[in-house]
Amino acid sequence: MIKLVLIRHGQSLWNLENRFTGWTDVDLSENGLSEAREAGAILKKNGYTFDVAYTSVLKRAIRTLWIVLHEMNLAWVPVHKSWKLNERHYGALQGLNKDETAQKYGEEQVHIWRRSIDVRPPALTEDDPRYEMNDPRYKALKKGEFPLTECLVDTEKRVLDYWHSEIAPKLKNGNKVIISSHGNTIRSLVKYLDNLSSDGVVSLNIPTSIPLVYELDENLRPIRHYYLSMDGEVPEGEIPKHISF
């Protein structure tokens, strides 16, 4: 049996401020740092270890992974970073307050942008100061590859490309893998692994910094999945609450 651990980054500063974040490189809040330490302690207490780790090129996911591995005394584990594990690009919504955006465009429209799988938010323009194409972390991307906005289907396409080319072969070779990433990135992976319908993924929420474990067969088909807490597996349908840490 193969085990895969997925973890969404801890609370970010813009999660705290209720802003659309996307590819904006926002750090963890103090609470997010605590959540990451708690996640590492949970994994260590439950006897987990890892051979290789994957994350995005955004600091909130990277820092969460660093803290988790530090808490587990696994700082030596090789870490692979890729833009393909970045959060969904929210286009011109990035940086905007979600409540204020709902007041401007209407709650129904914002809900469609956030939760539908195939509707993109308004795109950034290339002269927008939020356009990140010239950031050195993206220098390998061709202009046509760099998103100005994304729907969940767009995000899923790049995430699964990286899954099949990089992560799945490691799992099949017996490596113990952890992925520290973002809400929509993990939603994309869960949709694929569990073969969820479009309706099923719309209502799927991923909590910050709580380990989600998938037990997989030799073909990487899910046997079962569950969240972890200090007390072990959490009953199906329940999500553990963070404790003060």
UniProtKB/Swiss-Prot annotation:
Binding site for substrate: 8-15, 21-22, 60, 87-90, 98, 114-115, 183-184
Keywords: Gluconeogenesis, Glycolysis, Isomerase
Positions of the record's site feature: Transition state stabilizer: 182
Catalytic reactions on record: (2R)-2-phosphoglycerate = (2R)-3-phosphoglycerate
UniProt-annotated catalytic positions: 9, 87
One of the protein's GO biological processes: glycolytic process
Presence of the UniProt keyword Isomerase in the record: yes
Enzyme Commission number(s) from the entry: 5.4.2.11
Example of a GO MF term: phosphoglycerate mutase activity
Recorded metabolic or biological pathway in which this protein acts: Carbohydrate degradation; glycolysis; pyruvate from D-glyceraldehyde 3-phosphate: step 3/5
InterPro entries named among the record's database cross-references: His_Pase_superF_clade-1, His_PPase_superfam, PG/BPGM_mutase_AS, Phosphogly_mut1
Pfam family, one: His_Phos_1
NCBIfam families cross-referenced by the UniProt entry: pgm_1, PRK14115.1
Family of the protein in this entry: Belongs to the phosphoglycerate mutase family. BPG-dependent PGAM subfamily.
Purpose: Catalyzes the interconversion of 2-phosphoglycerate and 3-phosphoglycerate.
Protein name: 2,3-bisphosphoglycerate-dependent phosphoglycerate mutase
Record gene name: gpmA
